[in-house]
């Protein structure tokens, strides 16, 4: 501190050196408009110890002709060596800081006024801000180093001076008269505490006004986690199981808490807004948002949990950006620990990310800290965001939800349900996903690589492409209390035990996960790329005459306008030809001209990528496509037969694609679709029978193209059933059947020239087998072998026979019969191992 002459000399040299670079000014000329009584002592108070801040204040005082803070000041008969003090005292020579103590200078000043007869003393709060307000700053680089609420280290302070020092601003506030406070007669100690409190509130309010609100809970929350009863219990158990001291176990828990917790920073949120505004409007052609009023309606008084689908790494930031731009608080976002890397991890953390390990298994202390952190967010009303799919979808389908975060949320709500929790599904649709090229290998069947945000940098070479628009649809909110009332009516009256883990939790969590997935799919944003991909991939060579493609696109649009998938789903503007021109402009279609017109087709690379975009909306068309499938091998079918066979197949389509309608609603919805198909000329109705068009007609071609949207899905179902029936009862385990299905699908794709790697995706077979088990069509014996109900045969010979052409069924049966099941299973296991 420059409290003595030789130190003031050093301080003067430092100030002159600083001002070789720094330029400062007062905010609103506040230094020139102060109303001070120069006959009475004037002291300046700064919030935190900082020599550079003090040098700036001293310079501005000299400019305005005010008493200088580094000069002595007479206080009655005594002399204070300098006319300033810090609200937070300076650290001692060991670097320790007593944040609870008052400044000795303030103590002496108050005593002089209250006890020693000094007429008055004036305290002027002064704040120094390096750089512009985050709301005024447009440079992303400067926003990264802008003033924030975190305690700043020396290195960061130096960087801030170098980067932001040319626009340093100083705010002088109106003086506080100690005489007015002393005359309240509260005594020295209480008055001292009151002055400190007034100054703390003043600095906080001013800082909020200038740099934005303090969004971070980290400084107060992290240590509080260790005091929570469930965490204390886990610490004690860690001491006992690992034979370590209490102090060491607490240190481990604190390390976990620091690893997990986010550290919201308003300047970083503004930094991300500036970067992303450029990104969405330069790389993409903007973001289209629908139904955001649903969030605004439930934001007040509820704990909001955003549950977006996960297509790209930029999903992490997109939702925060949109909410911030629409005046809503950005959420705390669950991110994988793999993203907590130098620089990027820090930006993500200050943008709201909290980090979680991929597995908590075997680490009870980490589990307790993480669960308590989530519970604290929920109970304090901080909005959160996590991806129920776990990882990014490489296939474009809605992945089967992972229930871990949902279970933690449910348990937290059971523990404290005073603040209602509302899940808000958010569907994010890209016309061209940024990581599309990196997904290409995995779509072709390559092993899935570990996720890394550096995947984004691998696509820099492709940034010259047109990426189209991004669509964000907010789905119908799910109120957790209402959900529990439906599925566990007496949940509020039950004794849930100390860990809030009732027996019904797993099953209820699974139901909640399926509800979330269906609500996400309900909010599908159907874009031109989705529709063109759906149409062309339904042809044998991914090619169509331009006029034929326009007709089927017009059909898709007409059907969805007549029978909307859901109130949350959205459609693109324009007719089929307009959609074609749009997709052509994105260089996703190849073209060949001849005397008869143009043929549009997908080249090999785009054909594989197109499966991704088709899968985004396959659930929307699954039911009308299933209805159309009944007319591939049947020229006519009665309504009763169609409904019976559709009811048999629908549960498996619904489970795979998370289709919205329940089995009870199915008949009525099928009637709507039948009416729409009749109106579009794709079917003709005679009494209770539906008849397809003549095979030579355009309408027949459109009907068959619609049917082919789900043909591969139905083929996979039939493969698994054929293999089971061929192997016999109690011959295969679920894993063996899954491997057999994969080998069989690979063989069929080669034999029939299918360029669709997801056709032999193991996970799809795995979930189909699980659905058969859930519906009790299959059972496991004590050794894990599968036995099947007679319904399986009826499914194969009844429903499947009606929806799959005879040549496809014959080909599948021939491959299934080629070798004994044991030999094929051995080969598939070898393939899986290698």
From Swiss-Prot:
The keyword Lipid metabolism applies. One of its GO terms (biological process) is CDP-diacylglycerol biosynthetic process. It is a peripheral membrane protein. It comes from the Bacteria. A motif (HXXXXD motif) lies at residues 309-314. Coiled coil: none annotated. It is an enzyme of class 2 (transferase). It is found in: Cell inner membrane. It catalyses: sn-glycerol 3-phosphate + an acyl-CoA = a 1-acyl-sn-glycero-3-phosphate + CoA. InterPro entries: GPAT/DHAPAT (IPR022284), GPAT/DHAPAT_C (IPR045520), GPAT/DHAPAT_LPLAT (IPR041728), GPAT_PlsB (IPR028354), Plipid/glycerol_acylTrfase (IPR002123). One of its GO terms (molecular function) is glycerol-3-phosphate O-acyltransferase activity. Disulfide bonds: none annotated. The HXXXXD motif is essential for acyltransferase activity and may constitute the binding site for the phosphate moiety of the glycerol-3-phosphate. PANTHER family: DIHYDROXYACETONE PHOSPHATE ACYLTRANSFERASE, GLYCEROL-3-PHOSPHATE ACYLTRANSFERASE. This is Glycerol-3-phosphate acyltransferase. The gene is plsB.
């Amino acid at each position: 501190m420059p409290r003595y002459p030789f130190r003031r000399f050093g301080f003067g040299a430092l100030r002159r050196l600083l001002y070789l670079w720094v330029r400062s000014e007062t905010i609103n000329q506040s230094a020139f408009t102060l109303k001070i009584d120069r006959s009475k002592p004037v002291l300046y108070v700064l919030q935190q110890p900082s020599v550079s801040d003090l040098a700036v204040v001293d310079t501005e005082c000299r400019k305005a002709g005010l008493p200088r803070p580094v000069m002595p000041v007479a206080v009655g008969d005594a002399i204070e060596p300098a006319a300033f003090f810090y609200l937070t005292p300076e650290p001692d020579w060991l670097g320790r800081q007593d944040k609870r103590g008052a400044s000795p200078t303030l103590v002496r000043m108050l005593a002089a006024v209250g006890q020693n007869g000094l007429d008055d003393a004036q305290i002027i709060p002064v704040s120094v801000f390096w750089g512009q307000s985050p709301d005024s700053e447009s440079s992303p680089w400067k926003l990264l180093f802008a003033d924030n609420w975190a305690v700043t280290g020396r290195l960061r302070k130096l960087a801030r001076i170098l980067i932001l020092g040319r626009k340093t601003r100083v705010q002088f506030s109106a003086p506080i008269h100690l005489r007015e406070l002393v005359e309240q007669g509260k005594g020295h100690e209480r008055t001292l505490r009151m002055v400190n409190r007034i100054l703390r509130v003043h600095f906080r309010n001013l800082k909020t006004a200038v740099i934005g609100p303090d969004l971070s809970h980290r400084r107060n929350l992290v240590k509080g986690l260790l005091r929570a009863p469930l965490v204390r219990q886990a610490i004690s158990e860690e001491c006992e199981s690992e034979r370590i001291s209490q102090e060491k176990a607490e240190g481990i828990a604190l390390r976990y808490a620091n690893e997990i917790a986010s550290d919201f920073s308003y300047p970083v949120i503004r930094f991300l807004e500036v970067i992303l505004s450029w990104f969405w409007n330069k790389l993409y052609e903007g973001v289209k948002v629908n139904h955001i009023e649903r969030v605004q309606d439930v934001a007040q008084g509820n704990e909001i949990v955003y549950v977006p689908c996960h297509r790209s790494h930029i999903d992490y930031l997109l939702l925060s950006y949109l909410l911030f731009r629409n005046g809503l608080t950005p959420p705390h976002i669950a991110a994988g620990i793999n993203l907590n890397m130098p620089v990027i991890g820090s930006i993500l953390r200050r943008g709201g990310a909290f980090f979680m390990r991929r597995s908590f298994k075997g680490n009870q202390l980490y589990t307790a800290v993480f669960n308590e952190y989530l519970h604290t967010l929920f109970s304090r009303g901080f909005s959160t965001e996590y991806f129920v799919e776990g990882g990014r979808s490489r296939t474009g389908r809605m992945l089967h939800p992972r229930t871990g975060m949902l279970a933690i949320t449910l348990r937290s709500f059971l523990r404290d349900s005073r603040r209602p929790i509302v899940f808000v599904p958010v569907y994010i649709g890209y016309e061209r996903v940024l990581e599309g090229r990196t997904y290409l290998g995995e779509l072709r069947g390559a092993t899935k690589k570990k996720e890394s945000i550096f995947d984004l940098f691998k696509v820099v070479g492709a940034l010259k492409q047109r990426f189209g628009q991004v669509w964000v649809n907010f789905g119908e909110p799910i109120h957790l209390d209402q959900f529990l009332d439906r599925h566990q009516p007496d949940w509020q009256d039950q004794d849930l035990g100390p860990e809030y883990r009732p027996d019904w939790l797993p099953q209820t969590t699974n139901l909640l996960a399926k509800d979330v997935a269906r609500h996400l799919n309900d909010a599908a944003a159907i874009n031109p790329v989705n529709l063109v991909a759906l149409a062309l991939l339904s042809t044998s060579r991914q090619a169509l005459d331009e006029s034929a493609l326009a007709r089927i696109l017009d059909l898709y649009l007409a059907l969805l306008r007549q029978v909307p998938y859901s109130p949350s789903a959205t459609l693109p503007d324009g007719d089929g030809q307009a959609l074609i021109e749009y997709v052509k402009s994105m260089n996703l279609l190849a073209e060949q001209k001849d005397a008869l017109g143009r043929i549009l087709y997908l080249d090999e690379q785009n054909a594989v990528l197109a499966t991704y975009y088709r899968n985004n909306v396959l659930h929307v068309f699954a039911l009308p496509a299933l209805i159309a499938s009944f007319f591939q091998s049947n020229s006519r079918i009665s309504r009763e037969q169609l409904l019976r066979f559709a009811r048999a197949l629908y549960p498996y389509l619904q489970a795979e694609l998370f289709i919205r309608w329940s089995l009870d609603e199915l008949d009525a919805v099928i009637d709507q679709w039948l009416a729409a198909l009749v109106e579009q000329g794709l079917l003709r109705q005679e009494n209770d029978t539906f008849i397809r068009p003549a095979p030579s007609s355009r309408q027949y071609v459109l009907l068959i193209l619609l049917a082919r949207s789900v043909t591969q899905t139905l083929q996979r179902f039939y493969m698994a059933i054929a293999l089971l029936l061929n192997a016999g009862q109690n011959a295969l385990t679920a894993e063996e059947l899954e491997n057999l299905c994969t080998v069989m699908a690979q063989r069929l794709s080669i034999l029939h020239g299918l360029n669709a790697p997801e056709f032999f995706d193991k996970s799809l077979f795995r979930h189909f087998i699980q659905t058969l088990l859930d519906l009790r069509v299959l059972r496991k014996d004590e050794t894990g072998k599968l036995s099947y109900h007679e319904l399986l045969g009826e499914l194969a010979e009844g429903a499947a026979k009606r929806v799959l052409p005879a040549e496809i069924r014959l080909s599948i049966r021939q491959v299934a019969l080629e070798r004994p099941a044991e030999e094929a299973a051995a080969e598939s296991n070898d393939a899986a191992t290698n």
